[in-house]
Regions:
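Catalytic domains of carbohydrate-active enzymes, especially glycoside hydrolases
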Residues: 29-51, 106-114, 168
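N-terminal small/glycine-rich loop or linker at the start of catalytic domains
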Residues: 1-23, 75-92, 135-149, 192-199, ...
Length: 616
């Protein structure tokens, strides 16, 4: 048998910690081992894209572009790879062609060599702009075909999609098995067909989850696959990829030997084991719920997100119901593969169906957009009843979705204004307006607002930072400590024009073990209302879920409603950002808005009062 070295892409810096550690590894934790990783001889290092962009801005207070530059500066021999969601880029909706082109250009300039591009629906129209931009930048366009199991996803379907992508100029193909559903013998059939029909390298990306992936890799290797994805052992298994060390060992002495240095791999693993222990992060394990992926087909990473979402809603005990609801919703909307952003869209709809007790009563904007065709063509037929219920008489579009995107990069450049110091800042804002604006405000305030000695915490707004600075950080810290140690629930500090309120967080409401009423599992927050609201019989609109309250769809535009406005029943009042999606909240009565009871950008609890409306 002719020797054929198998290439290995290491996912440690991107998908591995996204899958197991909620994408919380910091750039500083990667730095000490980058040169060691560079010397291994990997086919590529996947280090950017996916959820890492959002997580840097939202949770780590880091600039994702700076992370890429830092990695590039320390990795000189190994190609750097990113995951790009086609027309979604690294976000959760479609962006205009000019934004896609500029994003690809800047990613290439900052260090990306290989762009793995996929579309959640395998709609090849959503590859076109990114593919052309990658080619123009002189970089490698790897087209990924998303694998799933459904009545409409056949072997011929995958070959047809792959053929269109090769015609588009793909330099290589990847089969993306995000849910670990690809069985060893089906992989053999699929890879054999791909190698027979297309003269481009084939890569296979599998998650471990239920444990099939190592066997699937071996059968795929025998069938001719060229490259596989793995992760260092502290970040392998469970929702992540198989361990690099295990796969390398399995191939030693075979015609497929990867020729990677095991001792160097173990040194890398020892370092990341230290990072894991310091971060308090878990190893990848396979639970019964994960093993049941072969039944419910919900990817492990999606299960982790669902668990997090339900904890936020104080309804973790409802997970089994949500897992039962997901396949039902998926079938109703045409069997989309459960990969970002469709995993969030379908999963969130299932959560809302279960927690509200009324199926399709609350529908996020993203689900509405999907049903309109704004993400692309559904793989299978969509339930006409669902379309009518959500869209009414509106018909789904038939053109390429990006052709209807109105916002341009220049529009966002004007919105963000002087907060943006470079095109990268404008792109971050275009993808995540609220999150990026908050980040840019924190980092462009200047050292005079650096009230905690290094950097203000991410949860402080610019106004709060200024107020704390004027009041004195040490005094604020002392007051916080005093409130925490006392029976006080709230203390107000006033000095001159500065007023700071320190308030204890209420304990989480208890959740009954038996599940209780479907619509009231999470205890509602019944905050005291003002006398004007109580005495005038105003209708109170409350938060139907835990989330972040926004009065407008973008920081630069007017609120949906203001005090004194007349609203109709069903009219949008605000947006609640929950479970990574934007959910429009409509008024359930017609009347006049008398009070807005929550601050813009504030975290709100289930049942918290948001608006007081005088019924018409």
């Amino acid at each position: 048998m002719r020797a054929r070295r198998i290439g290995i892409t290491d996912t440690t810096l991107r998908d591995a910690h996204q899958s197991l550690w909620a994408t919380r590894m910091r750039t500083a934790q990667m730095l000490p081992v980058l040169e060691l990783l560079d010397g291994v001889g990997f086919h590529s290092l996947e280090c950017w894209g996916g959820a890492t962009f959002d997580a840097c801005l939202r949770f780590l207070d880091e600039d994702p572009w700076e992370r890429l530059r830092v990695i590039r500066n320390h990795v000189n021999r190994t190609p750097l790879q990113m995951l790009l969601r086609g027309q979604n880029l690294v976000g959760y909706r479609h962006y205009g062609d000019d934004i896609v082109r500029r994003f690809v250009t800047k990613a290439a300039e900052n260090g990306i060599d290989i762009f793995r591009v996929f579309d959640a629906l395998n709609d090849t129209r959503n590859f076109e702009t990114a593919a052309a931009a990658i080619k123009d930048a002189g970089k490698h366009f790897q087209a990924a075909v998303v694998y799933t199991i459904s009545p409409v996803h056949s072997l011929d379907h995958y070959i047809e999609v792959a053929g269109r992508l090769v015609e588009m100029g793909a330099d290589s193909l990847c089969i993306k098995d995000m849910a670990a559903l690809l069985s060893p013998f089906y992989a053999e059939q699929l890879i054999t067909r791909l190698k027979a029909e297309f003269d481009v390298p084939i890569q296979l990306h599998c998650h471990y989850i239920g444990g099939l992936a190592p066997m699937t890799y071996l059968k795929a290797i025998e069938a001719g696959v060229d490259v596989i994805d793995t992760a260092t052992v502290p970040m392998a298994f469970g929702n992540s990829q198989p361990a690099t060390e295990m796969v390398v060992t399995a191939l030693i002495g075979t015609p497929y030997d990867s020729e990677l240095d095991l001792e160097r791999l173990f040194a890398i693993a020892k370092y990341f084991e230290t990072v894991r222990l310091e971060g308090g992060w878990d190893r990848g394990v396979t639970s019964l719920t994960h093993m049941q992926v072969y039944s419910h087909q919900v990817p492990g990473g999606m299960i982790s997100n669902l668990e997090s979402q339900l904890k936020e809603q104080n309804a973790l005990d409802r997970l089994p119901e949500v897992l039962e609801e997901i396949p039902v919703v998926r079938a109703e909307v045409g069997f989309p593969p459960l990969v970002t952003p469709m995993s969030q869209i379908v999963g969130t709809q299932a959560v809302l169906n279960v927690l509200s007790g009324k199926r399709w009563h609350i529908v996020p904007d993203e689900m509405k957009a999907y049903l309109r065709g704004r993400y692309g063509a559904a793989p299978g037929p969509v339930s006409p009843e669902i379309v009518e219920r959500v869209l009414g008489d509106e018909r789904p579009i038939s053109v390429r979705p990006a052709e209807l995107v109105a916002e341009t990069l220049d529009d966002f450049r004007v919105e963000v204004g002087e907060l943006a110091h470079a095109d990268e800042d404008v792109l971050s804002y275009a993808l995540f307006p609220q999150t990026a604006r908050a980040y840019l405000e924190r980092h462009h305030l200047g050292p005079e607002h650096d009230v905690f000695g290094t950097q203000a915490p991410a949860y402080l707004t610019s106004q709060m930072q200024t107020a704390v600075s004027e009041a004195g950080a040490d005094r604020v810290k002392d007051i916080i400590a005093m409130v925490e140690a006392s029976d006080l629930q709230e203390l107000i500090l006033e000095e001159g024009d500065v007023r700071i309120t320190v308030r204890k967080t209420a304990p989480e409401p208890a959740v009954s073990g038996d599940g209780g009423d479907r619509a009231t599992t999470a205890a509602a927050v019944r905050q005291p209302l003002s006398p004007a609201v109580e005495n005038n019989g105003y209708h109170v609109v409350r938060a139907p879920m835990v989330g972040t309250f926004y009065r407008a769809s973008s920081p630069a535009i007017e609120p949906f409603v203001s005090v004194g406005d007349t609203v109709a029943a069903g009219q949008t009042l605000c947006i609640l950002e929950a479970m990574k999606l934007m959910n429009e909240l409509g008024s359930d009565v017609g009347g006049v808005v008398r009070e807005v009871l929550a601050d813009n950008g504030a975290a709100v609890e289930y049942g918290q009062p948001l608006f007081a409306i005088e019924p018409a």
